[in-house]
Amino acid sequence: MNLSSLRPAKGSVRNKKRVGRGQGSGNGTTAGKGNKGQQARSGYKRPIIEGGQVPVYRRLPKFGFTSRSRKTITTINLLQIEQWLEQGVVSNELTVQDFKTLLHASNTDYFKVLGAGEVTQPITITAHFFSKSAEEKIAAAGGKTIIAFRTLAEAVNIKGLPIEEALLKEKVKLVKVKKAKPTA
C-alpha cells in the first residue's frame, strides 16, 4: 500500500451537480426549482411555510423563558492562580479587573474562586465569591480574601448585613464596573 493507491470508499464521493446546464444533464431548464413562483427565484425563501403540513413551531410545545435577572458566574481555581504567580503574569494582588483581562471574560457578572490546587505564597484576591476550601487555603498561605460587590444593595443582600456594617467590614469592597460604550 502506498499513497498513490489510496482511494475514497466506494460511493462516499459524488460529483457536484451542475444545475441549469442543459436538458441532457437532467438538471437543466428550471435547475430543480420547479416552475415559477417565489421558490423558483434566487434569494430568500420563507422558512416557516410548510404547505398544508402543520409547521414545526406549532407541533412543538412552548416551554421556559429567558430570565432578565440572570447573572453569569465565571469560576477560577487556585491551581490557575498559582500558575499565573509562578509565570509572573500577576503580582501578589488579584482584582476583578485582572480576572476580566486574564480570562477574556468582559461579559461576566461575577467571579468565583474555587479551591482546586494549592497556594504557596501569600496573595490578596478580590472576587465576588469564594468557596470555603479556597478561603482556607488562601488564609493558610498567609493571604487575604476580599469580597467585591458591585452595589451596596448587593452587599446587603448577599451578606445579609445592614449597609453601615457592610461598609465597615474589611471583607466588603465596592467595585465600580464601567459599562462599555456601544460601538457602531
From Swiss-Prot:
- Disulfide linkage: none
Q: Which Gene3D superfamilies match?
A: 3.100.10.10
InterPro entries on file: Ribosomal_uL15, Ribosomal_uL15/eL18, Ribosomal_uL15/eL18_sf, Ribosomal_uL15_bac-type, Ribosomal_uL15_CS
Give the record's keywords alphabetically: Ribonucleoprotein, Ribosomal protein, RNA-binding, rRNA-binding
User: What cellular component GO annotations does this protein have?
Assistant: cytosolic large ribosomal subunit
Q: What does this protein do?
A: Binds to the 23S rRNA.
Listed HAMAP family: Ribosomal_uL15
NCBIfam families in the record: rplO_bact
* Similarity section: Belongs to the universal ribosomal protein uL15 family.
Q: What's the protein here called?
A: Large ribosomal subunit protein uL15
Organism of origin:
Chlorobium chlorochromatii (strain CaD3)
